């Protein structure tokens, strides 16, 4: 059986994607095991002779940090923490994102700076491997002290509480534990805090978004090129000379891709009567490229985050230190997630403008891309749908990270609101995918009005594959199923 070994090697987003998509199981490697054991042993020894309070280990939490807890109550303190912080509400987080949360939490704990028992980490790994996925809710995290409420829901099953997805059903964790022959784990000092304090809710949403944004960004170029051909657009704005004098990486990449995809196109080679195209066509390298550059930057930030220890306090056995600090704060990823939402929203914004041009009865295309307009409305309303989605995404692009509401009697007086940035980002990604699917629906229709001229072999191949599931529309028909099939096509 193929396993991914949890270690201190750099974990890439591409590797995370492979683990999730191929359902690869994980094992805690020797390096990680020893780091976890060493840190736990150090903490146990420290508890016996330390003469001062240690936040979250021998004290209460948040503004209760000045209340010292007797040694005999430390386990109950951690148990209470997990229960009391499970205050999420709203829609459930999709299981594939919760599975990402599990993986990222395991990775973070295995650096050996959190003080958890090896048994605890292995239980999380067992849950991951057996596809026992905790039920987590979208609302409840401020994005500092980490993602407390959602991570509490994720970790409730460890102590035999909460609910899980198992074999297609939502079940009580205690019942599933009984079936598996697992006992609830008795948490030791600091463990509850190590489990709850972290950025894995935000990070998992960010990783999911990046994986899908990369795919959608690629499709934006393909679909935009098909629209350009259908609109009888000019090839000159994509020539390399233009982009050498403004050498943004994403811009150069986009122009190069579009040129490659238009190679040997009869439509592109045909003489044009118009001097230039609207911005939504000729500025694709600049707009799509800016989204690519943003995605590249955000990916680098998130990759650093998923290779980090993000709980508090941080334990350093080699230096004989337990330091209360702020690695749980989500600001380093909240701002980039807001940026990525804006970038992806712009892909849908420019896409909707191309849709509008295609249905406007210009350049030899019939109004609303239907031969017998009047009795037929044709592609009039898909543009309305795209416009409504784009408008929603624009509203969602108000940055979450500019907000902060103090909590815990103002001990936690600045928070990132990164969890809100994360959930908004997921919605914007989904919206962008749908708008691009609607553009494909329109572009494929419009391209056929260019016959007998053909586009490039590449674009014609994409068109042929798409036509296997969505037909040319000759007369008005029920459009919704074709929009949904278009979305499915982009996910293949």
Located regions from the model:
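C-terminal auxiliary extensions adjacent to catalytic cores
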Residues: 2-24, 28-35, 39-42, 47-50, ...
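FAD-binding glycine-rich core of flavoenzymes that anchor FAD
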Residues: 113-139
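Alpha/propeptide regions of enzymes that mature by internal proteolysis
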Residues: 92, 115-117, 218, 307
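FAD-binding core of FAD-dependent oxidoreductases
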Residues: 55-69, 73-77, 84-109, 137-159, ...
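Cysteine-centered functional microenvironments
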Residues: 136-141, 318-322
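Short secondary-structure transition/capping motifs
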Residues: 28, 32, 66, 70, ...
């Amino acid at each position: 059986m193929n396993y991914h070994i949890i270690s201190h090697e750099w974990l890439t987003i591409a590797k995370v994607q492979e683990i999730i998509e191929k359902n690869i199981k994980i094992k805690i490697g020797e390096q990680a095991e020893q780091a976890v054991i060493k840190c736990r042993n150090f903490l146990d020894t420290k508890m016996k002779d330390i003469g001062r309070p240690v936040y979250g280990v021998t004290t209460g939490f948040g503004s209760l940090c000045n209340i010292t807890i007797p040694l005999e109550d430390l386990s109950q303190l951690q148990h209470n923490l997990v229960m009391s912080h499970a205050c999420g509400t709203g829609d459930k987080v999709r299981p594939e994102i919760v599975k990402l949360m599990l993986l990222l939490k395991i990775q973070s704990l295995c650096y050996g700076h959190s003080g958890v028992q090896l048994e605890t980490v292995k239980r999380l790994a067992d849950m991951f491997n057996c596809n026992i996925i905790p039920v987590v809710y979208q609302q409840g995290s401020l994005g500092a002290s980490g993602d407390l409420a959602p991570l509490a829901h994720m970790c409730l099953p460890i102590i035999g509480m909460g609910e899980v997805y198992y074999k297609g059903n939502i079940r009580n964790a205690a019942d599933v534990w009984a079936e598996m022959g697992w006992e609830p784990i008795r948490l030791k000092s600091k463990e509850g805090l190590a489990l709850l304090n972290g950025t894995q809710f935000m990070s998992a949403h960010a990783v999911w978004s990046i994986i899908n944004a990369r795919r959608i960004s690629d499709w934006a170029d393909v679909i935009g090129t098909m629209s350009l051909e259908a609109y009888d657009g000019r090839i000159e704005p994509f020539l390399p000379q233009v982009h050498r004098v403004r050498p943004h990486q994403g811009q150069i990449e986009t122009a190069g891709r579009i040129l490659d995809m238009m190679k040997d196109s009869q439509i592109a080679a045909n003489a044009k009567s118009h001097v230039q195209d609207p911005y939504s066509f000729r500025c694709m390298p600049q707009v799509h490229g800016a989204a690519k550059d943003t995605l590249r930057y955000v990916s680098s930030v998130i990759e650093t985050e998923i290779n980090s220890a993000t709980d508090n306090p941080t334990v350093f056995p080699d230096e004989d230190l337990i330091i209360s600090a702020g690695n749980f704060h989500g600001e380093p990823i909240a701002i980039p997630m807001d940026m990525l939402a804006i970038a992806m929203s712009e892909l849908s914004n420019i896409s909707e403008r191309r849709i509008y041009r295609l249905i406007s009865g210009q350049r030899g295309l019939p109004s609303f891309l239907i031969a017998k307009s009047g009795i037929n409305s044709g592609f009039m309303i898909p543009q309305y749908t795209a416009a409504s989605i784009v408008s929603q995404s624009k509203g969602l692009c108000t940055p979450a990270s500019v907000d902060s509401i103090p909590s815990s009697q103002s001990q936690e007086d600045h928070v990132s609101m990164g969890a809100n940035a994360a959930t908004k980002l997921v919605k914007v990604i989904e919206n962008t995918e749908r708008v691009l699917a609607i553009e494909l629906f329109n572009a494929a229709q419009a391209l056929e009005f260019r016959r007998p001229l053909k586009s490039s072999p590449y674009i014609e191949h994409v068109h042929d594959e798409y036509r296997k599931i969505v037909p040319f529309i000759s007369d008005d028909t029920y459009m919704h199923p074709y929009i949904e099939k278009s979305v499915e096509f982009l996910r293949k």
